[in-house]
A protein has these predicted regions:
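Sec-dependent signal peptide hydrophobic core
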Residues: 5-9
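Positively charged n-region of N-terminal signal peptides that target proteins for export
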Residues: 1-4, 18
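C-terminal motif of bacterial Sec signal peptides marking the signal peptidase cleavage site
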Residues: 14-16
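Buried hydrophobic residues that stabilize the cores of well-folded domains
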Residues: 20-337
Length: 337
């Protein structure tokens, strides 16, 4: 399931118009709406020359872990195929995602996943838009219609994201008994200048909608932006505090798309969706139970096409050994446009 959703996220991130304004401060692009017919996009859904037709991800030893191929006709993507590989190079699974549209807006996506061991999974996700903004999505499992995941978005009066509510039926154990309930993730957003604060609550409620307060977990995030790039993220719970800082190049990020913002209103919480490409990432985790601190640093290297879009991305982990700084290759991504 995680691989299926990851495939959709990557695919959705790549669809759409790539225009952005070179304004300073926080998020200065249009707020999660498709381009109008009279703007300089000409109402087109897909850009020309910057849309990756194929993306290949490779492990540290150069073997392909998975690759995505997109079927684009005219100004819309009709389908995308994702193939996952085992370590020995053989195919582990295939996912075919097909899209239908209502005008310029996606209406439905169907997922068909097949594994070499004979297991198959089918999903359907529908989208609902109100006043040009995504209002809700519904993900249904064809083999289990009860397991329907819904996501509802609400917005402040200025059009900025206010809340994301995710509800997913699950089975859990209570007092030694297996019971059906609903797992809820509720995230509230506030916007102050170039900082967005998110308060995330996770809890269970029964099928009648009664909340179980004893299972509530609370996490607070802050996102700081500069020139449409996410430069700092903090995450805080009762158990730990984490800070991640990013730096960027001045080139074009193929994942920075208006359509991504339309289909994923909380796109901004992932640095991979920033305007430019990540150069460095430093994460510092502090744990309360033993007062320990763990620091991880990564460096990104690219080759670029003539239009300043990346052809390859390599991610290295930085470490120091006997006073000497070293880099270890973690993964490589290759883009074909």
């Amino acid at each position: 399931m995680k691989k299926i959703m990851a495939c959709l996220v990557i695919m959705a991130a790549l669809i759409g118009c790539s225009k952005s304004d070179d304004q300073g401060g926080g998020l200065s692009t249009p707020e999660n709406t498709l381009p109008k017919k009279n703007d300089d996009h000409g109402g087109k859904t897909l850009p020309k020359g910057v849309f990756p037709k194929k993306i290949a991800h490779k492990t540290e030893n150069g073997n392909i872990s998975y690759e995505i191929t997109n079927n684009v006709q005219g100004e819309k993507i009709l389908s995308t195929t994702s193939i996952s590989y085992k370590r020995d190079g053989s195919i582990e699974s295939k996912i075919l995602i097909s899209f239908s549209y209502e005008g310029d807006y996606p209406k439905e996506a169907t997922y068909k996943r097949s594994k070499t061991n004979g297991e198959n999974e089918n999903y359907t996700e529908t989208y609902s838009f109100v006043d040009g903004k995504l209002k809700n999505t519904t993900l249904k499992h064809d083999t289990n219609p009860r397991a329907t995941k819904t996501t509802t978005y609400s917005y402040h009066n200025d059009g900025k994201l206010a809340k994301v509510l995710v509800e997913e039926p699950r089975k859990s154990s209570l007092n030694g008994q297996i019971m059906e309930d609903i797992y809820v993730t509720e995230t509230d957003y506030t916007h102050t200048g170039n900082v967005i604060t998110a308060t995330e609550k996770r809890y269970f409620k029964d099928t009648q909608g009664n909340k179980r307060d004893e299972n509530t977990s609370l996490t607070t995030y802050t996102y700081t932006f500069e020139n449409e790039n996410l430069i700092k993220v903090t995450e805080s719970t009762t158990e730990y505090y984490s800070t991640t800082e990013y730096t960027y190049d001045e080139k074009n990020n193929p994942l920075f798309q208006n359509f991504k913002k339309l289909m994923d209103p909380d796109y901004f919480n992932d640095a991979k969706n920033s305007k430019n490409n990540i150069l460095t990432r430093k994460t510092t985790d502090k744990y309360n139970y033993n007062s320990s601190t763990i620091v991880n640093e990564h460096v990104y290297e690219y080759t670029y096409a003539d239009n300043n879009y990346p052809l390859t991305q390599k991610i290295f982990r930085k470490r120091t050994e006997n006073g000497v700084e070293k880099k270890e290759l973690g993964e490589t991504t290759e883009y074909a446009y």
